């Protein structure tokens, strides 16, 4: 999830991670009596970090697996820091070579595969993990993030030819210099690569574990992180418990400009982490059920969804009843974008003929973002026209969309390009058959409201709507196969740089993160040029051109960036929502004496 400007390389190299490891593995600090109860809004898809893409599965992976890098818990804006690495990487050759030194004495969680013997983490584990992204059998949605490693293209091509990826083959771009040192060489300059290795997806796995559970690696996560998966009822409940092999981390961070940091430091300074012994995650797809569970003290933290914001947060502050009960609010702006795309490879709506582009743009022109924020978001969002959100390097607050709400213009476009209305008032294809737009959404009450809003929008321009209902994991599966025509989707920053958002439209990422399966050679050439550039006015200019090309071709309609309102029960100590980190429970505590 993140980004790095060239002038900051030296300072990053000098940075030290505030969560320093203890000199020897301590007695487990986590207290089994400290149980954190949280919820996921949609179902997880699994826990093989190379294979998952969604926010919820990645949250669990972040608690179980350890990437080489991470982020400082308190620093804002997000600040890169070592995790399994001893220090920041040594970067050379114009950011084409990265060398990581791995901490000694890190061990994987117990598993029968290890035959009761301690299994230490080594540089070879990270080399193996990186190779897994390029194995065609894994179909990793994050393959492109590791696509720049020198020599892996050839290994992948041979795997496609033979049907088997050769993990033992020497690769120029992945050199294990010694047991604890990994050198990565890239084909091109990449100032963001250290941020890529902070992704939860890049957490180290043990080869013997993957091979032992090859039939279902999503169900058998074994990592070196602070937690282990001890129970999983798919789409229902996930239970994590503290990893007894975890080395322990000492809580120490410098305060940011946030006034609340002083209180957090007073409560947490010097504690051995993690403190929480058990994390129970319930899948609660309906907003009302989650809200009631929090009110009944069945949840310790609630990501308050839009439906109940007017009740819980009058004037964006907790209501009097919640305040009396000691409930507090953590409110931030998410580094995310929310948008509706149209699949440009669809046989009916796809392609780049002028009439198809006009049709897609007309559909987007019919949709009123202001109404969407008022009705669906209940005011808990900011209208956003640019695909790089506030707080992320490359955001352009001055950008104005060429597909604003304008149903009059939409109707003129449709009339001009021959999408005429029949006697029933609905439009037809130029060949006379009914024109029906297909849209996918989940069965949740919020999505039903969104269906109605799209129905209302399309009625303005005389287009019929067919809504296909799918659970979220099935939507993702179909989307990655370029089988969905359209969906309202979200992308939250993997790392705080605009590249993480621009890669959503890169042609070769179709089948991964390019939901619209948008492929345009001119766009791809310009994007690849930006990949080798640090943050600069020139890169920002190219980003603006790239986004304009996406809008001109009727690929996507930007909607908003959300406020994230987290309600905290009084027993939650030291919590701070991070813009990039997902499993914040690694860094905060529970005080059972404060439970109601």
Where do the language-model regions lie?
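Bacterial N-terminal signal peptides
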Residues: 8-23
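Sec/Tat signal peptide C-region and signal peptidase I cleavage site
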Residues: 23-29
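N-terminal lobe/hinge region of extracytoplasmic solute-binding protein
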Residues: 39-93, 222
């Amino acid at each position: 999830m993140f980004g790095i400007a060239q002038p900051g390389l030296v300072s990053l190299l000098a940075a030290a991670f505030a969560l320093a490891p203890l000199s020897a593995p301590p007695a487990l600090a986590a207290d089994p009596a400290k149980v954190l109860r949280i919820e996921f809004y949609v179902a997880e898809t699994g826990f093989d970090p190379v294979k998952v893409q969604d926010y919820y599965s990645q949250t669990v992976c972040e608690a179980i697996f350890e990437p080489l890098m991470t982020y400082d818990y308190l620093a804002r804006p997000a600040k890169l820091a070592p995790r399994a690495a001893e220090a920041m990487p040594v970067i050379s050759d114009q950011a084409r070579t990265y060398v990581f030194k791995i901490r000694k004495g890190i061990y994987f969680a117990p598993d029968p595969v290890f035959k009761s013997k301690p299994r230490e983490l080594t540089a070879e584990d990270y080399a193996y993990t990186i190779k897994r992204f390029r194995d065609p059998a894994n179909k990793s949605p994050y393959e492109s993030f590791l696509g720049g490693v020198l020599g892996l293209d050839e290994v992948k091509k041979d795997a496609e030819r033979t049907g088997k990826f050769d993990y033992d083959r020497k690769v120029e771009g992945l050199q294990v210099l010694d047991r604890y040192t990994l050198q990565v060489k890239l084909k091109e300059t990449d100032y963001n690569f250290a941020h890529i290795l902070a992704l939860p997806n890049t957490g180290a796995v043990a080869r013997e574990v993957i091979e032992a559970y090859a039939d279902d690696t999503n169900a058998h996560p074994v990592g070196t992180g602070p937690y282990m998966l001890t129970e999983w009822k798919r789409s229902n409940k996930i239970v994590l418990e503290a990893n007894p092999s975890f080395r322990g981390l000492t809580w120490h961070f410098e305060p940011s400009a946030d006034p609340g940091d002083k209180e957090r430091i007073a409560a947490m300074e010097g504690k051995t982490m993690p403190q929480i012994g058990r994390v129970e995650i319930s899948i609660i797809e309906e907003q009302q059920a989650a809200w009631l569970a929090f009110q009944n003290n069945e949840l310790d933290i609630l990501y308050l969804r839009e439906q109940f914001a007017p009740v819980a947060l009058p004037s964006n502050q907790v209501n009097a009843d919640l305040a009396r009960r000691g409930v507090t609010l953590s409110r931030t702006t998410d580094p995310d974008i929310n948008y509706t795309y149209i699949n440009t490879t669809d046989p009916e709506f796809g392609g780049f003929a002028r009439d198809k582009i006009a049709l897609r743009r007309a559909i987007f022109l019919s949709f009123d973002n202001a109404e969407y924020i008022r009705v669906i978001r209940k005011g808990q969002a900011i209208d956003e026209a640019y695909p790089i959100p506030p707080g992320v390097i490359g955001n352009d607050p001055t950008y104005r969309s060429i597909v604003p709400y304008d149903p009059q213009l939409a109707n003129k476009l449709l009339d001009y390009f021959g999408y005429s209305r029949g006697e029933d008032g609905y439009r037809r294809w130029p060949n006379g058959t009914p024109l029906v737009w297909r849209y996918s959404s989940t069965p949740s009450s919020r999505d039903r409201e969104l269906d109605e809003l799209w129905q209302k929008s399309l009625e303005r321009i005389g287009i019929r709507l067919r809504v296909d209902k799918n659970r979220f994991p099935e939507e993702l599966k179909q989307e990655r196969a370029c089988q969905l025509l359209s969906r309202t989707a979200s992308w939250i920053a993997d790392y705080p740089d605009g590249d993480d958002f621009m890669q959503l439209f890169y042609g070769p990422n179709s089948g991964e993160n390019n939901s619209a399966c948008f492929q345009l050679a001119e766009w791809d050439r310009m994007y690849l040029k930006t990949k080798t550039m640090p943050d600069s006015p020139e890169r920002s200019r190219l980003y603006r051109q790239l986004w304009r090309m996406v809008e001109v071709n009727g690929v996507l309609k930007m909607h908003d960036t959300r406020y994230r309102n987290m309600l905290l029960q009084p027993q939650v100590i030291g919590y701070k929502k991070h813009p990039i980190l997902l499993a914040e429970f690694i860094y905060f505590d529970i005080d059972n004496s404060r439970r109601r």
